[in-house]
């Protein structure tokens, strides 16, 4: 995938594989949905090198240009994730729900630069069995 801008054309590509302990993870809000979802996110965030908040869809853009490693969200609607999923996947990333299934319906999302950091984040907290979140 490529993007055209004022500096010309650039290739979109996620970061190469790295350990979660070297990763940058982002989410929109520190509380990431319910208290249970927040605890699951914090389990992953404590393992990461750097955590940032408040990026909304900009986090997905940073993922597609190789600036961060993970976007972890909860409480999303399908319209929140359709476009970011397409761009992240075109850049070589992986996007699933927290259980590793399709993410197109929204809900709890892990968008990762590569399968390795995705698997590690899932193992450290986001794959925990959680009740279905309520969408408002």
Could you tell me what each predicted segment is?
Residues 13-136:
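An extended, acidic
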Residues 9-11:
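Short, mixed charged/polar active-site loops
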Residues 1-5:
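Short polybasic amphipathic segments
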Residues 6-7, 31:
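Short, charged N-terminal helix-start/capping segments
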């Amino acid at each position: 995938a490529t993007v055209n801008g004022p500096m010309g054309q650039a290739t979109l590509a996620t970061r190469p594989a790295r350990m979660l302990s070297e990763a940058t993870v982002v989410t929109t809000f520190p509380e990431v949905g319910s208290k249970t979802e927040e605890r699951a996110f914090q389990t992953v965030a404590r393992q990461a090198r750097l955590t940032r908040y408040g990026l909304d869809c900009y986090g997905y853009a940073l993922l597609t240009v190789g600036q961060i490693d993970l976007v972890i969200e909860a409480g999303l609607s399908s319209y929140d994730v359709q476009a970011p999923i397409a761009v992240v996947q075109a850049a070589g990333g992986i996007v699933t729900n927290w259980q590793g299934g399709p993410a197109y319906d929204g809900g709890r999302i892990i968008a990762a630069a590569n399968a390795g950091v995705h698997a590690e984040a899932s193992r450290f907290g986001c794959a925990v069995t959680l009740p279905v979140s309520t969408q408002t």
